[in-house]
Amino acid sequence: MTTPLADFLRTYAASGMARLHMPGHKGRGPLGCEAWDLTEISGADSLYEAAGVIARSEENAAALFGSAATFYSTEGSTQCVKAMLFLALQNRPAGTPPVVLAARNVHKSFVHAAALLDFEPLWLWPEEGTSSLCACPVAAEGLDRALSALDAPPAAVYITSPDYLGNMADIPAPVSYTHLTL
């Protein structure tokens, strides 16, 4: 597998070219990685309109992950969570309220998205006997109860996996149930 983005950065960093562009550190600094810190300059591609080295790198990542597509983002997973919820809310049936069912151990970016996008999170509480809010396994039965209590389908069901303790959720069960029910 090729490494188009890393290859470009390595070549640019070694070129000795005058950096008359952002960022202001000009490729120098105490960490040693600043030479690889670039903005959208000629050849570096654009994160939001990838057509060159970033696009090829994303294609490689998708092949590695076995996914149909992979997109890099800024802000870590925070921006991805916000974008995902925005799209889910845009695709909900007309006239349905902006509701998202969510396990109680969501990242704070989910809560920020709820405020920014003006939707109401309805919490999926952990099953009896769960000793921590960091571990919030969502069983199909709990999801069934939550869905049954709604007047209309939610825009999305949001489950954090792995959780903050490293536990993996049984994603296939609630996904299968949700697809059958909604």
Segment roles from a protein language model:
Residues 54, 75-80, 106-108, 163-167:
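Gly/Ser/Thr-rich loops at beta-strand to alpha-helix junctions
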Residues 34-79:
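Conserved N-terminal alpha-helix of the aminotransferase class I/II PLP-enzyme fold
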Residues 177-182:
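Conserved small/polar residues in nucleotide/adenosyl-binding loops
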